[in-house]
Regions:
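Alpha-helical multipass membrane-protein architecture
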Residues: 2-782
Length: 782
């Protein structure tokens, strides 16, 4: 949502696709730049500016963006050379590139740099927006219970909103109405870009990242603990957890929205797609590697192709979804299934023909993030999960020979799923005597590794932000930050901003309701613990927001907050998940009541509650048993505490190397992504991350570099078409077939892949006999 606020604001004149300047725009070449006078040179750009002022602003830009990984090397080198040489010809050219448009090719590819005065606050925009966000919020709540999860994104809403907006005038009456002194019409004119943009902003605000954390809390309570606080608690939980974040985000907009470097890559798909829907003109083949098709027609082809294709991996031939052919050959070989399996293995041959596997679990389209983000995530996945986890697992560390390689479950010392009811009191707190008599908790190798990497990422993001973004934050915190305004930000000034105190009141009001929520129900969450949770959110908003705004990779705070509260108030499982609206809640309640065998591993239509299962396991680890028993020195997973140190040290090493070699590729290394780019694993699998990374490399590196014209014109439209086709097909399959019990006739392509140890989550090297246990001797754990 935040980035999109800049996308549909006013822009200065440019071409439709942002590739070439229009005749009205004054782009100065060396020959056009005025000669430097003896005392006071003038740089003639779209507005006259003194040479000294231009040099100062470029120097400020250089300082703020010195380590910006989204700027190309040539750009930074040109700016540095021009500033040092004080050459007005070079300064004129670079000044236009940096301040009169956007210095980022991604933004120029998707956003026009001129504005049209069009109405947007219309009854049509609000009616369509509210209708579609209501429907999509419910669908996302339902799909979050499915594996792999699927998100109805705002791109889908864009497509559906377009024919509704265009057809509005055909059914609505004419006439002008007067409400509270404000005149409005049911027919405000042709459906336009800004109305469409308002609908998209509503969609991003309602379900920009799928469903809220509160849904995982409710699934963990209802689906795994059998606990239900009722509608009153659920409604307050939904409102407070969603709106507290809006208050914090609004207060931080000077640092996370206004800077040009905060590109919010996911919003670029929205803007490119809206332009494609409203502009059906053909493409200039000289600017797009020979392609002349309009973006609108191209989108339709991709959309239809994606829709038709998903019937195969999603319903007719499900073996195409996880193409782990090696496991089909040896379905009962433990090592083969651990190494090559795509469900609970490492997927060493990561092949999938299913866009859901590539974009599921909130990874989103790999055509969106910049290449450096994809590369860091790929390197992190290979290093930590393929190399390190393989070594740990086959060394027998953490008693891994008795456990799966990769899943999101917790286990006892007999290799069975951890039975939480054996250690709970009637008040849903820990019974220590029962715990000592039962079993310590064990995790799969990748699941345990994920917790260690989460520790490192939380530490790394703080130090990385201070070192690599500290100067930019400092500049924007002072009046000097205005010197960094690009054309998009400057022209947004004609719109009256929301006062900062509105966000402050929202935050304080929702914080007050949060206290009422946790104190009025038996959550066992103390008021002072809630205050600490809010403070953590405030402190980490800027670091995590900067990473998200520049990479499209979201680093969650849930592990850190669960860890802290687990130490402060151990033995209470519900509060660990509380840390982490109405429509999502209603659909969630319906699904939990009416879908047969929901949240069970073998659920017929894959409604296995993957996110809720992870939250449930986290609540057992951090809330019920407590991190002291699992991660402290001398405990089974105590070694993972060293990841805090690693996350604190690595950013300093990277920064030192970047300072020593300022024109090297070191500035593209991101320690938060190296440690935390795989934050969704589990419930995501190595297959998801590896296939996502490989597709990203193809589009964001190979095609972007070799076919820049095509990439600038069609990359984001390709992403939109694939996402929309997949989503609409999935909705039809689930609503019309899965929920009605209509299955495709059985054949090898749908049955054979489900008989492997990888799919059944039974690929373990050793099993204990009846009456035996593995791990620490009985009763020795604390």
């Amino acid at each position: 949502m935040s980035g999109l606020l800049k996308r549909f604001g006013p822009k200065q004149a440019d071409s439709v696709d942002g590739l070439e300047p229009s005749p009205q725009q004054s782009t100065i070449s060396s020959a056009q730049a005025p000669e430097k006078t003896e005392n006071n040179a003038t740089i003639s750009t779209a507005r006259d500016i003194e040479e000294a002022d231009a040099n100062r602003r470029l120097a400020t830009f250089e300082r703020a963006h010195r380590w910006d990984p989204n700027l190309e090397d040539e750009q930074l080198h040109d700016i540095d050379d021009a500033v040092n040489a004080r050459d007005p010809n070079s300064e004129a050219r670079i000044f236009d590139e940096v301040f009169e448009n956007s210095p980022y090719p991604e933004v120029r590819a998707a956003v026009r740099n001129y504005d049209e005065d069009l109405p947007c606050n219309t009854i049509r925009a609000w009616a369509i927006g509210i209708l579609l966000t209501t429907i999509a919020s419910g669908l996302n709540a339902l799909f979050s219970l499915r594996s792999p999860t699927l998100t109805v994104t705002s791109v889908v809403i864009q497509l559906v909103a377009y024919p509704l907006g265009v057809g509005w005038d055909l059914i609505m009456p004419s006439g002008t109405f007067n409400t509270f002194g404000r005149k409005w019409s049911m027919k405000p004119g042709p459906f336009n870009l800004k109305e469409h943009g308002l609908i998209v902003i509503m969609a991003n605000a309602a379900f920009g990242n799928g469903v809220g954390y509160f849904t995982d809390t409710i699934v963990a309570q209802r689906g795994f603990y059998g606990q239900n606080f009722g509608w009153g608690f659920n409604i307050l939980l939904a409102i407070t957890t969603q709106c507290v974040g809006f208050g914090i985000a609004g207060l931080m907009r000077r640092y996370l929205v206004e800077p040009a470097s905060m590109i919010w890559p996911k919003t670029l798909v929205n803007t490119a797609f809206i332009y494609a829907l409203h502009d059906h003109s053909k493409t200039d083949p000289s600017k797009s590697n020979g392609w002349s098709i309009s973006r609108y027609r191209y989108f339709l082809y991709v959309f239809v192709g994606s829709f038709v294709w998903y019937w195969f991996p999603g319903y007719i031939a499900k073996f195409l979804s996880i193409f782990a052919f090696v496991t089909w050959i040896r379905p009962h070989n433990v090592v083969i299934n651990q190494l090559f399996g795509g469900s609970t293995g490492l997927s060493l041959i990561p092949i999938t023909f299913d866009w859901t596997q590539i974009t599921g679990y909130s990874l989103y389209s790999p055509l969106i993030p910049p290449f450096f983000a994809i590369a860091n995530t790929l390197v992190g996945t290979v290093f930590w999960y393929i190399i390190i986890c393989t070594g740990i697992h086959y060394s027998g560390h953490w008693y891994s020979e008795y456990l799966p390689m990769s899943d999101s479950n917790s286990y006892d010392n007999t290799g069975k799923l951890y039975n939480v009811s054996k250690i709970l009191t009637p008040e849903f707190t820990l019974d220590e005597e029962k715990y000592k008599a039962y079993s310590p908790l064990f995790l799969s190798t990748t699941f345990a590794m994920t917790y260690g990497l989460s520790f490192a990422a939380i530490a790394a993001v703080i130090f990385h932000t201070i070192l690599f973004h500290g100067e930019e934050i400092w500049i924007h915190g002072r009046a000097v930050g205005d010197d960094l305004e690009d054309n998009h930000t400057k022209m947004m000034r004609k719109y009256k901003p929301v006062p900062w105190w509105w966000y402050g009141l929202l935050f304080l009001g929702m914080a007050g309701m949060s206290f009422a929520t946790v104190c009025a129900w038996p959550t066992h969450l103390s008021w002072w613990a809630l205050i600490i949770g809010l403070l953590i959110a405030v402190v980490w908003t800027i670091p995590i927001g900067i990473i998200y705004a520049t990479t499209n990779v979201h680093l969650g705070l849930n592990v850190f907050t669960e860890y802290i509260i687990g130490y402060m108030q151990p033995g209470r499982p519900v509060i660990a998940t509380l840390w982490s609206c109405f429509v999502q809640l209603a659909v969630m309640e319906w699904g939990l009541r009416h879908i047969p065998n929901i949240c069970e591993q073998g659920q017929a239509n894959n409604f296995t509650c993957p996110n809720g299962r992870v939250f449930f396991t986290a609540s057992v680890i951090f809330g019920l048993i407590g991190p002291r028993r699992i991660f402290s020195t001398g405990s089974l997973y105590g070694g993972l505490q060293y990841f805090w140190l690693a996350g604190s040290v690595v950013p300093f090493i990277a920064y030192a190397l970047a300072r020593m070699f300022p024109r090297s590729k070191v500035r593209f290394f991101s320690s938060p992504l190296f440690f935390g780019g795989m934050v969704q694993l589990p419930p995501a699998t190595p297959l998801n991350y590896l296939s996502w990374s490989l597709v990203g490399v193809v589009f964001q590196r190979i095609i972007r570099n070799r076919y820049r014209g095509w990439w600038m014109r069609f990359n984001y439209i390709t992403s939109a078409g694939l996402d929309v086709g997949l989503t609409i097909c999935t909705i039809i399959i689930i609503a019309a077939l899965n929920l009605t019990g209509t299955s495709f006739p059985k054949w090898w392509g749908n049955t054979a892949p489900t008989t492997t140890m990888d799919f059944l989550d039974t690929a373990v090297q050793k099993k204990v006999s009846a009456g035996e246990i593995f791990g620490p001797p009985a009763g020795s754990w604390k």
